[in-house]
Amino acid sequence: CRKGKGVHAGANRAQRWRRAIRQAHGPLFCLKADISKYFASIDHARLKAILRRHIHCDRTLRLLDAIIDSSPGRPGVGIPLGNLTSQLFANLYLNELDRYAKHDLGIRYYIRYMDDFVVLHHDKAQLQAWRARIEQFPWSALRLTTNSKTQIFPVGPDNGRALDFLGYRIYPTHRLLRKNSIKRIRYKLRRFKRAIAA
């Protein structure tokens, strides 16, 4: 686990930014998106090219190539869910999108966790312009598409909508677990209790 990263750090940052934008500008809008079938869509050749920009040891690259090529599914596409290397590869692959959003587009309030990301801003029109560019980039650079559920919506007390991200409904002063998250936890606890009782 990387220090200052992860679900809680992302939720803290989103909450802090939500407060800051609201105090500075009043209205707040959110662009929320995720990559469609992310792990199954990662292009092997592009992933290997990205790895070669960061790693220069031939033995290490041969080993990583073998891991990537051993992925089940369509030849040349997809990495298995759950592998530790897959998590590393997935983060490195979408680092290209992070750099594009932050450096090329100049987006300040951008947070990504694996294949889910949000962009916060006070101007809805600016978010719409960024959305068009962000939706083009993953396909042209990485052969990925954003999910059809991608949306821009107002956040705040005026419409009663919370910032829904990383399993939380995020408000300026507190966070609540999503109802689906609570249901999943209860279900797992019931299964665990049954397993212990058996």
List each model region and its residues:
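Conserved polymerase palm-domain catalytic core
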Residues: 8-9, 13-114, 118-149, 153-155, ...
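Active-site and adjacent loop segments of nucleotide-processing enzymes
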Residues: 164-198
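Non-catalytic nucleic-acid substrate-recognition regions in nucleic-acid-modifying enzymes
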Residues: 4
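Active-site substrate-recognition loop segments, prototypically the cytochrome P450 B′-helix/B-C loop
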Residues: 1
